[in-house]
Amino acid sequence: MMHLKNIKSENPKTKEQYQLTKNFDVIWLWSEDGKNWYEEVNNFQDDTIKIVYDENNIIVAITKDASTLNPEGFSVVEIPDITANRRADDSGKWMFKDGAVVKRIYTADEQQQQAESQKAALLSEAESVIQPLERAVRLNMATDEERARLESWERYSVLVSRVDTANPEWPQKPE
């Protein structure tokens, strides 16, 4: 199975390549071990999955046809077309690590960013519930049930706003 690492654009290495670059603006892609992508792409097997991954091992593309890839700035590996490998996608939630496709392992910073996004989404959801209830109270149109619901959502909103995204513990959402 082929594995081309750290593919980057570099200068042509032969007179023929130089001429192609001069005439057609060809960009030459080379792996870290000096292999030419355009020659190697034909050596991938037809019955395998080709995975493109970045410098952090995050999968950014998956295909059966290597000729459809533009791997500049990435690495490409072919893996067996088996069920365990077919579960991966290019959503950013999978990685190629130690020769296998695995669920992505997030760094502490990435986990905190995800928690911050979740916090913002939960606060937005709470505000969308709170606003019409506040309006009903302000206009003296709220039922006792709506007043109680408003209070529980406001309490929830305050608790969410206090969540430490470095170590999140999310409060129970009101019903």
From Swiss-Prot:
Top-rank taxon: Viruses
Induction (record text): Expressed in the late phase of the viral replicative cycle. Expression of late genes is activated by the viral late transcription activator C. Expressed alternatively with tail fiber assembly protein U'. The switch from S-U to S'-U' is performed through inversion of a DNA segment called G by the phage invertase protein Gin.
Pfam hit, one: Caudo_TAP
Knockout consequences: Viral particles lack tail fibers in inversion-defective gin mutants (blocked in G+ orientation; no switch to S'-U').
Keyword Chaperone: yes
Keywords for this protein: Chaperone, Host cytoplasm, Host-virus interaction, Late protein, Viral attachment to host adhesion receptor, Viral attachment to host cell, Viral receptor tropism switching, Viral release from host cell, Viral tail assembly, Viral tail fiber assembly, Viral tail fiber protein, Viral tail protein, Virion, Virus entry into host cell
Annotated localization: Virion; Host cytoplasm
This protein's GO CC annotations: host cell cytoplasm; virus tail, fiber
Gene Ontology annotations of biological process type: adhesion receptor-mediated virion attachment to host cell; symbiont entry into host cell; viral tropism switching; virus tail fiber assembly
Keyword Chaperone found: yes
Family: Belongs to the tfa family.
More details: The orientation of the G segment is defined as G+ and G-. G+ orientation provides S-U fibers whereas G- provides S'-U' fibers. S-U and S'-U' dont have the same host range (e.g. respectively E.coli and C.freundii).
Protein task: Chaperone involved in tail fiber assembly. Remains associated to the tail fiber and participates in the host receptor binding. Binds to the primary receptor. Two alternate tail fiber assembly proteins U and U' are encoded extending the host range of the virus.
Name the UniProt record assigns to this protein: Tail fiber assembly protein U
Species annotation: Escherichia phage Mu
Upper lineage: Viruses, Duplodnaviria, Heunggongvirae, Uroviricota, Caudoviricetes
